[in-house]
A protein has these predicted regions:
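Membrane-proximal intracellular helices of multi-pass ion channels
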Residues: 1-136
Length: 136
């Protein structure tokens, strides 16, 4: 198994998630809300995933590498998507944030929020964007 290639792929996908956080960051700024949940999440993802995406790899991507990459991508995208929810302070635990993120990226549509409209506009946009990205 080509572990370096899998890690490089994971880093690149997580960088795409970090890039997609720029949209709700803009929504937060537009509505005068705190951009910190998104800025912090983007910073964490850049610090952890940029070195992975720049890693040198050998040739060859095999079927088992693909299976490992897809499984790990689902897990890591859910964790990365939970970061803005967590840093916003609008959720009671990281488990709730992870559930909300996984629900979005898998297009399940389930939520733990009793009053969705009470969340900030940036977080609502991020929640909607996770559902849209999951549907792609």
């Amino acid at each position: 198994m080509n572990v370096k290639l899998i890690l490089k792929l994971l880093g690149r996908v997580e960088l795409l998630i970090a890039g997609s956080m720029l949209l709700p960051l803009g929504v937060s700024l537009l509505y005068g809300e705190s951009p910190l949940p998104f800025l912090t999440s983007i910073a964490v993802l850049l610090c952890t995933c940029l070195p992975l995406s720049l890693m040198r790899t050998g040739p060859g991507f095999f079927l088992r590498d693909g299976f490992a990459a897809v499984g790990l991508i689902w897990l890591l995208v859910s964790v990365a998507g939970a970061l803005p929810f967590y840093f916003s302070g609008e959720f009671s635990s990281f488990t709730d944030c992870l559930f909300e993120s996984a629900s979005g990226f898998t297009t399940t549509g389930a939520t733990i929020l009793a009053d969705i409209e009470a969340c900030s506009k940036g977080i609502l946009f991020w929640r909607s964007l996770t559902h849209w990205l999951g549907g792609m």
